[in-house]
Amino acid sequence: MKLTPKDWLGAAIAVVVAAVFVRLGIWQLDRLHQRRARNAVVTARRSLPAVTVTSAALPVDSVRDRRVTLTGTWDYARERVWGARTYEGVPGVAVLTPLKISSDAAVFVDRGWAPSADALHVDHTALREGDSATVTGLAFAAPRGRGDVDPVRLRDSLPYAVASFIIQPSPSDSPAVRLSDLRRWPASDLGDGPHLSYAIQWFAFAGIVLIGMGALLRKQASSRGVEQPRRATPSSETV
C-alpha cells in the first residue's frame, strides 16, 4: 500500500490525537489510584475511636476525617447558611450553627440541609433543635476564604474562639425538628467515582481513531489502485 504525503500527514495527525486520548486515559487511572489511596486513609481514620472535643484549639489534622463527639449549647444568633445547596434536585441551604463547648470556645456544626425557595433564606426559628445538644459526626477542615465560617476571618467578629474544623453530624443523628425542614447530609461517598469508566472511554476513543484512520488509508489506496489501470487503458483501438 503506497501512501501519499497527504496520507502520511493524516496518519500523523491521527497518531497524535490517539496519543492524547491515551494520555487522558492514563491520567484518569492516576486519579483513580489517588482516590483509592485517599479513601483508604479516610476509612482508616474513621475506624479510629471517636475524639471527644473539649477545646476549639485542637489542630485540624488531629481530627480531620475522624469521628468526634462534642457537647454544648447552640448559638442560634450567630448561625450561618451556605446558599445554593441542592438536595435531590430541590434548592436549599446548608445550616451551620456554632455549638459552644465552653464560655469562650465553639465549633461550627453543619446541621444539614433545609429547603429554600431562593436558595439563600430560611426560617431559622423553625430549624432550632433545642438549647443544648451532644453531637456525633465527622470533622472536616473549615474552608479558607469563606468569610462566613473561616476561623481567621471570624476571629474578630465572634465573642469566642472558633475551631478550625467543622462537624458534620452522622446521618443517624436525627435532628430534633421535622425532617421536612432539616435533613442531615448523607455519608460522603468513598467509592471509586467515574475515573475508570472515563479511562476506558479515552482508550476506546484512541482505538477508534487509529482503526478508523487505518480503514480510511486502505480505502484510499484501493481507490487509487483502481483508477490507475483505467487511465492507462486507451479509449479506442488504433487502426
Language model features with spans:
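Surface-exposed, charge/polar-rich loops and edge strands
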Residues: 1-239
